[in-house]
UniProtKB/Swiss-Prot annotation:
Belongs to the radical SAM superfamily. Lipoyl synthase family. Gene3D superfamilies: Aldolase class I. Residues 67-283 form the Radical SAM core domain. Its EC number is 2.8.1.8. HAMAP family: Lipoyl_synth. This is Lipoyl synthase. It comes from Chloroflexus aurantiacus (strain ATCC 29366 / DSM 635 / J-10-fl).
């Protein structure tokens, strides 16, 4: 479920001859190298608290910009995922036992950074019955205790269709519930072998039914082999379950062993996706080459609330 955001050279599709085609990145895909006082302060705090961020684990190109604004997306439940999605840079394998003290450390970090908006995400934890949902809930509760004015977005996995786990997260009343659809149905099982497109749609529909005023959000990556028409179809499908906020960004492979980049989608096409989504009723759309789920997340909740 992690956002794929590599900083290194991307893997790209191989031509029929078998030679690896590695074109230079377009200018619009270049991000500023991370640095600055605030960046190093956030980095130090994460190390001191033994915390993980999706910013680092998924190699986000926006890490410098976000951390210099003293914002970060906290990665709960460790840094090892039980799934092997073909696009994701986060480590895979057998994770350590869940750290029940992690919510306290995250809440302390949110307070230290004086955040007004915190984003919580996680690896998949198919090795535990609730998928780690209780850690999401406890983290939300502790953030609210320590920083009452801080709004919280959760970017959750599918919990393998465990709707009781979803209910646990919803009961903690996050301000935004995000679950990324990631790609189009035709590519889904190859891109995300242990996930199901319709299950993700059902999760978003259940969240809306359980909490009608909740801001719901989803995102996808493009340039992975889909057609633009398929992107429009996914946009329509997400609106059919009343998703409020949509993010669309360029797929970039961590290295050549991952799912290949098939093409670089142009800024003009991203603008067309945004216009189409807004016309279909999304209240906030981020669509651009370097857009990732958590980018400008603090702007989404106000724009999207019913």
């Amino acid at each position: 479920m992690a956002e794929l955001i590599p900083l290194n050279e991307v893997g790209v599709a191989q031509p029929a001859s078998g030679a690896v085609n590695r074109p230079r990145r377009p200018e619009w895909l270049k991000a500023r190298a991370p640095g600055g006082v605030n960046y190093h302060d956030v980095l130090r705090l994460m190390r001191e608290k033994n915390l993980h961020t999706v910013c680092e684990e998924a190699r986000c190109p926006n890490i410098g910009e976000c951390w210099n604004h003293r914002t970060a997306t906290f990665l709960l439940l460790g840094d090892i995922c039980t799934r092997g999605c073909r696009y994701c840079a986060i480590g895979k394998g057998k994770p350590k036992p869940i750290d029940e003290n992690e919510p306290e450390r995250v809440a302390e970090s949110v307070a230290h950074l004086k955040l007004k908006f915190a984003v919580l995400t996680s690896v998949n934890r198919d090795d535990v019955p609730d998928g780690g949902a209780h850690i999401f809930a406890r983290t939300i509760e502790l953030i609210r205790q320590k920083v009452p004015d801080c709004k919280v977005e959760v970017l959750i996995p599918d919990f393998d269709g465990n709707w009781d786990a979803l209910a646990t997260v919803l009961a903690a009343e996050p301000d935004v519930l995000n679950h990324n659809i990631e790609t189009v149905p035709r590519l889904f099982r190859r891109f995300r072998p242990r996930a199901k497109f319709e299950q993700s749609i059902e999760l978003l529909a259940r969240a809306r039914a359980a909490r009608p005023k909740l801001v719901t959000k989803s995102g996808m990556m493009v340039g992975a082999g889909e057609t633009n028409e398929e992107v429009y179809e996914v946009i329509d499908r997400l609106r059919s379950v009343d998703v409020n906020v949509l993010t669309i960004g360029q797929y970039l492979a961590p290295d050549a062993s991952y799912w290949p980049v098939h093409r670089y989608v142009t800024p003009a096409e991203f603008a067309e996706f945004r216009s189409y989504a807004l016309a279909r009723g999304f209240t906030h759309v981020e669509s651009g080459p370097l857009v990732r789920s958590s980018y400008n997340a603090h702007l989404h909740v106000g724009a999207a609330q019913h």
